[in-house]
């Protein structure tokens, strides 16, 4: 089980990071507009 988690963790991080980056850009743009 631990081996599977070691493989899944990096994949989850890589799949989540781009979404978080987009959200941060949108928030920054929103703050700039307001």
Swiss-Prot record:
UniProt entry tagged with the keyword Thylakoid: no
Propeptide: 1-10, 19-34
Tissue: Expressed in basidiocarps.
One Gene Ontology term of the molecular function aspect: toxin activity
Record flagged with keyword DNA-binding: no
PTM remark: Processed by the macrocyclase-peptidase enzyme POPB to yield a toxic cyclic octapeptide. POPB first removes 10 residues from the N-terminus. Conformational trapping of the remaining peptide forces the enzyme to release this intermediate rather than proceed to macrocyclization. The enzyme rebinds the remaining peptide in a different conformation and catalyzes macrocyclization of the N-terminal 8 residues.
Entry-linked InterPro entries: Amanitin/phalloidin
Cross-link (Cyclopeptide (Leu-Pro)): 11-18
Keywords assigned by UniProt, alphabetized: Toxin
NCBIfam families: amanitin
Family: Belongs to the MSDIN fungal toxin family.
Role: Probable toxin that belongs to the MSDIN-like toxin family responsible for a large number of food poisoning cases and deaths.
Official protein name in the record: MSDIN-like toxin proprotein 3
Protein's organism: Amanita exitialis (Guangzhou destroying angel)
């Amino acid at each position: 089980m631990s081996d599977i988690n070691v493989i899944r963790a990096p994949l989850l991080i890589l799949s989540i990071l781009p979404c978080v980056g987009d959200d941060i850009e949108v928030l920054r743009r929103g703050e700039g507009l307001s």
